[in-house]
Design a protein with these regions (language model features):
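Active-site region of glycoside hydrolase catalytic domains
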Residues: 2-123, 134-154
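Residues that cap or flank secondary-structure elements
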Residues: 39, 127-128, 160
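C-terminal/domain-terminus segments
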Residues: 150-169
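Short, acidic/polar
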Residues: 129-136, 167-169
């Protein structure tokens, strides 16, 4: 923080990237009584305090605060926005790779209402993704907590047809 304290407000810091125990949100965090969530919330507070204490432009720089694993669903049960000496300068950071079987595992290579049912993830693909954004809005944005999606997307696809679904996603 000290190295960049004199850089303008075009620079935003984010505390961490995808902090988790190796289980990507499906590990010990599920049954440790909230210990990992509490630890990350404490680290986020320490991050805000350290950046603010360095002075200069950092006194009111916008800071990105990640939830556990930057996962929208996990954040609903665990995220605590740190206290801050600057007003309205913290943003929640989330990532979205839903549905996993399409975006990262690539076990399904088509997505959406026009996809071949045997080649897409079951369910209402567009509706399921819309619900992710609704969760973000209802639980954070509507309550005055700004959110940015630091990562969103899916792995590359091999065929022209699969690439068309990737673009649609």
């Amino acid at each position: 923080a000290d190295k960049f304290k004199d850089k303008g407000d075009f620079l935003i810091f984010e505390a961490f990237n995808e902090i988790h125990d190796g289980g990507w949100g499906w590990g010990a965090n599920r049954n440790d009584g909230g210990k990992q969530y509490k630890c990350l919330n404490e680290w986020n507070q320490a991050f805000v305090d350290a950046v603010r204490a360095s002075g200069g432009e950092n006194a009111d720089r916008i800071l990105g605060i990640p939830a556990y694993c930057t996962n929208v669903d996990i954040s609903l049960e665990s995220f605590v926005m740190p206290e801050d000496t600057a007003n309205d300068r913290l943003m929640m950071s989330v990532h979205c790779y839903d549905p996993y079987d399409y975006t990262l595992a690539a076990t399904k290579n088509e997505w959406g209402h026009t996809a071949d049912a045997s080649k897409k993830v079951a369910g209402d693909n567009e509706g399921d993704l819309k619900r992710v954004f609704e969760k973000i809005y209802v639980n954070y944005i509507s309550k005055g907590i700004p959110v940015y999606m630091g990562e969103f997307g899916c792995v590359n696809r091999a065929t022209v047809r699969e690439q068309a679904f990737q673009q649609y996603y």
